[in-house]
Regions:
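N-terminal Rossmann-like NAD(P)+-binding subdomain of aldehyde/semialdehyde dehydrogenases
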Residues: 2-146, 338
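Residue-level signal for inorganic ion chemistry
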Residues: 26, 44, 80, 102, ...
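A structural signal for short, well-ordered beta-strand elements
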Residues: 37, 51, 73-74, 106, ...
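Residues at or immediately preceding the N-termini of alpha-helices
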Residues: 41, 55-58, 77, 95, ...
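Conserved C-terminal structural/oligomerization subdomain of aldehyde/semialdehyde dehydrogenase
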Residues: 43-49, 232, 268, 368, ...
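Structural signal for hydrophobic packing residues in well-ordered secondary-structure cores
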Residues: 69, 73, 88-95, 99, ...
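Rossmann-like NAD(P) dinucleotide-binding subdomain of oxidoreductase/dehydrogenase enzymes
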Residues: 136-277, 405
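ALDH superfamily catalytic-core signature
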Residues: 242-385, 448
C-alpha cells in the first residue's frame, strides 16, 4: 500500500539503518522483490535496506512519470524554476542526513560527504536558473509571406541511472537538467547507496508535483527494465563501461542515451611546472574519495628534469594522508572503499605493476588496525611501465602510477593511449607547452595547472570509451530537449 508519510521525517541515529521504498506519485510503495541489505564498508554495520523493484513495479514508476509529463511540460519555465529552487532548499535542510547516509553507505569521510551534498544543492539551483533560459529562434524563409519558428521542447519521461561513488551529486546532475527542461524522471540509484535516495524522495514529496521525480531501487535487472521501457524517451547513465555497453544494447534504437563511463585519466608534468602545485594537485585528484571518481588521476607522466622531485613529493604527501572511518573521523583525508571488488582490483593492480618492475614508494596495502573495513593506504608506484594495468586500465582506487618522459609529444601520445577520454591534467608554466597540451590531449575535459576538470556551467562529457553526451552547463539542459520547426504562412493566400 502507498504511504504519504515521510519515512525519515527527523534525523536518525547513525546506527539505525535507512529503510527504502519505491517512490512514485509522491508516495512510497512496498515491493514484492527480495530486499537488498547495504552494509557500511568501514565496519560492516547495516546501513540501509532497499527493495529489488520488479519489472511491474518499475513500470508503475514510469507510468507515474508519463502521466505527470504533459502538465509539467506545460508549466511555465518560471514555475519550474521556482519549484526546483524549493527542492534545493528542502535538500539543504536535510544536508546532514544526506551526508551521513553517504558516509555510512559509500565510505567517504563525512566532511567530504557534506561537500558532495552542497554540490548537489548547487546543481539544483543552477538548473533552476537555466530553466528560464531555453530559447528558440525565428528563421527567415525564401518565400514571401512565410516565417519559420524553431522551438525546443522536452523529450518526455527520462531515466537517470546513477552510480555509488557520488550517489547524491550525480542524481542532481540528471534530476536538475531533466526537470528544468520540462522532462519528468525516474531515478534508479545504485544498490550500494540506496539510503541517500530515500532521503531525497522525502524532499521531493514536500516540494514537487506528483510524478515529476520518482525513485526505484534494485540491481542491474531493475536498471534494464527501466532503460528498456518504451515510455522512456532518454536514459542518462553514469557508471562502468561494462554496464554502459549493456545499456547500449538494451535501449530501443529510438531512445535517447547519454553515457559517462569514466576512464584512465592522465596527468602530464613538464620541467617548467610548479612542482609543489603539481604534487598537491596529483595528491588531491588521485586519492580524493579513495580514488573512486571517474576523473581520478590514474597515471602521471613527468619530464625527467623534475621526475625525482615530483615522485618524492607525491610519495611524502600520500603517506601523510589520514585514512580512517569517515564517521569517527569526519575530516579524514581518505575513507573506506565502497566495494570489495574495488578493494581487490586495487591490490591486483599494485601486484601487477610491481611484478613488471614498478617500485612502491608510498602505501602498498591495507591499513593496519582497521580490518575488516575496506581501507587501503594511498599508494604511489614509481617508474610504472607502460604495460602495467595501472597505466592503462581504470583502477578506481587509491593508486597512481608515475613514469618519466623526455619529449612532450611522446608524453601526449602516451597520455592519449588509453581507451577512455574523459579528463586529462597538465602542469606547465610555459605558454607554448600549455597550448600544445590543451590541444593535443584528446579528452572531453582538460585542466591545466589545476585538477578541477568539471564546473557546473560548462559541458562535461567524454570521448571514445568514456561515452558520449554532455552534462553540466546549457549543454546539459539541451540534452533533454528536442527541436520543433513550425512554418507559418502569414501573407495573403
Amino acid at each position: 500500500m502507498p504511504s504519504n508519510a515521510p519515512q525519515e521525517a527527523a534525523a536518525m541515529p547513525h546506527t539505525a539503518p535507512l529503510v527504502c521504498r519505491n517512490f512514485h506519485d509522491n508516495a512510497w510503495h512496498d515491493s514484492t522483490g527480495e530486499p537488498i541489505e547495504r552494509r557500511n564498508p568501514a565496519n560492516g554495520e547495516l546501513a540501509a535496506v532497499a527493495p529489488r523493484a520488479t519489472a511491474e513495479e518499475t513500470a508503475r514508476a514510469v507510468a507515474s512519470a508519463r502521466d505527470a509529463f504533459p502538465e509539467w511540460k506545460r508549466a511555465v519555465p518560471a514555475e519550474r524554476s521556482r519549484l526546483l529552487h524549493e527542492l534545493a532548499a528542502a535538500c539543504a535542510t536535510r544536508s546532514e542526513d544526506l551526508a551521513t547516509a553517504i558516509t555510512r553507505e559509500q565510505g567517504k569521510p563525512l566532511d567530504e560527504a557534506r561537500g558532495e551534498t552542497a554540490k548537489f544543492v548547487t546543481a539544483l539551483h543552477y538548473y533552476a536558473e537555466e530553466a528560464v533560459r531555453v530559447y528558440g529562434r525565428t528563421v527567415p524563409n525564401d518565400t514571401p509571406g512565410f516565417l519559420s519558428i524553431v522551438e525546443r521542447e522536452p523529450l518526455g519521461p527520462v531515466a537517470g541511472i546513477v552510480p555509488w561513488n557520488y550517489p547524491v551529486e550525480l542524481i542532481g546532475w540528471k534530476l536538475g537538467g531533466a526537470t528544468a527542461a520540462g522532462c519528468t524522471i525516474v531515478v534508479k540509484p545504485s544498490e550500494y547507496t540506496p539510503g541517500c535516495a530515500q532521503v531525497l524522495s522525502e524532499c521531493v514529496a514536500a516540494t514537487l508535483p506528483p510524478g515529476v521525480v520518482n525513485f526505484v531501487y534494485g540491481e542491474g535487472g531493475t536498471g534494464a527494465a527501466l532503460a528498456g521501457h518504451p515510455d522512456i524517451a532518454k536514459v542518462a547513465f553514469t557508471g562502468s563501461l561494462r554496464t554502459g555497453e549493456a545499456l547500449f544494447r538494451t535501449v530501443s534504437g529510438i531512445t535517447g542515451l547519454s553515457l559517462e563511463l569514466g576512464g584512465s585519466c592522465p596527468m602530464v608534468v613538464t620541467d617548467t611546472a610548479d612542482v609543489a602545485a603539481a604534487v598537491a594537485g596529483a595528491t588531491r585528484r588521485s586519492f580524493r574519495n579513495a580514488g573512486q571518481i571517474c576523473i581520478a588521476v590514474n597515471r602521471v607522466y613527468v619530464q625527467r628534469g623534475v621526475y625525482e622531485a615530483f615522485t618524492a613529493g607525491l610519495a611524502e604527501a600520500a603517506d601523510a594522508l589520514t585514512v580512517a572511518d569517515g564517521l569517527a573521523v569526519p575530516d579524514a583525508d581518505v575513507g573506506a572503499l565502497t566495494m570489495d571488488e574495488t578493494y581487490r582490483r586495487t591490490l591486483d593492480h599494485i601486484e601487477d605493476a610491481v611484478a613488471r618492475g614498478a617500485e612502491v614508494v608510498a602505501g602498498g596495502g591495507p591499513v593496519d588496525g582497521l580490518a575488516p573495513g575496506l581501507f587501503l593506504r594511498p599508494t604511489v608506484l614509481a617508474r610504472a611501465p607502460a604495460d602495467a594495468l595501472v597505466m592503462h586500465d581504470e583502477t578506481f582506487g587509491p593508486l597512481v602510477g608515475v613514469a618519466p618522459f623526455d619529449d612532450l609529444d611522446d608524453a601526449i601520445e602516451r597520455a592519449n593511449g588509453a581507451p577512455g577520454g574523459l579528463a586529462a591534467y597538465a602542469y606547465t608554466q610555459d605558454t607554448r607547452e600549455t597550448f600544445a597540451l590543451a590541444r593535443g590531449l584528446d579528452f572531453g575535459n582538460v585542466a591545466v595547472n589545476n585538477v578541477d576538470a568539471g564546473i557546473m556551467n560548462a559541458p562535461y562529457g567524454g570521448r571514445r570509451e568514456s561515452g558520449f553526451g554532455s552534462e553540466h552547463g546549457p549543454e546539459g539542459l539541451a540534452s533533454y530537449l528536442q527541436y520543433k520547426h513550425v512554418r507559418l504562412r502569414h501573407g495573403a493566400q
